[in-house]
Amino acid sequence: MAATDLERISNAEPEPRSLSLGGHVGFDSLPDQLVSKSVTQGFSFNILCVGETGIGKSTLMNTFFNTTFETEEASHHEECVRLRPQTYDLQESNVHLKLTIVDAVGFGDQINKDDSYRPIVDYIDTQFENYLQEELKIRRSLFDYHDTRIHVCLYFITPTGHSLKSLDLVTMKKLDSKVNIIPIIAKADTISKSELHKFKIKIMGELVSNGVQIYQFPTDDEAVAEINAVMNAHLPFAVVGSTEEVKVGNKLVRARQYPWGVVQVENENHCDFVKLREMLIRVNMEDLREQTHSRHYELYRRCKLEEMGFQDSDGDSQPFSLQETYEAKRKEFLSELQRKEEEMRQMFVNKVKETELELKEKERELHEKFEHLKRIHQEEKRKVEEKRRELEEETNAFNCRKAAMEALQSQALHATSQQPLRKDKDKKKVGGWSSIYSVTIP
């Protein structure tokens, strides 16, 4: 026998012994205690209605719970699909029910329907995430927490009588791992019984061939196994909704009045409304809640914890405690943090070096530019000095020539001023001799 088998046998817990009681103890009242506690606490049930605008989702919900929920009418011009949740407090006898109805407003109204399913998937994941965050709190209060996880998705199929639309197949395929899907044919009174029967067979065949997993009513409980097995054969349910009362015979019944006759909502020969209501509310409501928690939510929780690095065992199938997982994840985080810090430090050093090189290159370029400008300045200065010397030389030469000219002009002026004076003297001398001559000659 292998060592691992021996360890497994040695670590296995011993089988509990069965003992008989000598008298009445009282723990047989545990079911009554559980019922009393549940009734005091109340219940929550969340329904997601997916279908095209105007297909009768709100009317069917009003018919289901025999009341009128105040809802806004949706238009056919929504830019995108949006989820509209509304919560109501209902009471039947002494049982309180917090009912949330989530309507996928604008589904199927867009020209491009490729991502019509995405807001629905995101909404379901958001409710799972909110519940997971509440569970992971140190001080959590799940007793008072309003559970908004979707327990069932009623998928309304348009009664075309031919086959499912591509949008329906894609959407249900995206949702089947996240929510319990119950497909229903809306406004079933618009097609004949023979067409309806063929349509049901066609729908189930397409769902199976495309691998879409819809909710199957459980048959493992003997109390409801027989009726659930029969009802599974009626899927998808063909329903008619109406809040109007019509007099049939001596009774007022909920029905739809047509010129050719009356379609009674609660007449099983006319539609499957009663079957759907019985299966959804009276028989399998708790199973839908349990399936949501134990299957769909656990799948989401497991995937999220695995993304965070948590696991139950290592590669050798050795179990991990939460403390060990935390320590391993902490060491991994610290090593990753150190690696990131080293990368950041190295990036910073490299950036500093690159910046220094860039600054040195800029400094060299500026120095070269400065030297170039300096040489240009010196050359210009030398040229200016040469021009200044040439100008001074020309100025001196000009001044010399000017002085010489002034001297010549002065001499010429002086000579010119002396010559008239001499002429005057000569004239005076000639005039004197003439008078002498005039006196002496008789």
From Swiss-Prot:
Record-listed Phosphoserine modification sites: S10
Query: Where is region (G4 motif) located?
Result: 186-189
* Annotated segments matching region G1 motif: 51-58
Q: Which region ranges are annotated with the description G3 motif?
A: 103-106
InterPro entries according to UniProt: G_SEPTIN_dom, P-loop_NTPase, Septin
How is expression of this protein distributed across tissues? Expressed in cerebrum, hippocampus and cerebellum (at protein level). Expressed in heart (at protein level).
- Which positions in this protein are listed as binding GTP? 51-58, 106, 187-195, 241, 256
Q: Name one GO molecular function term.
A: SNARE binding
Keywords, sorted A to Z: Acetylation, Cell projection, Coiled coil, Cytoplasm, Cytoplasmic vesicle, Cytoskeleton, GTP-binding, Membrane, Nucleotide-binding, Phosphoprotein, Synapse
Composition skew (Polar residues), residue ranges: 411-420
- For this entry, the protein name equals Septin-8
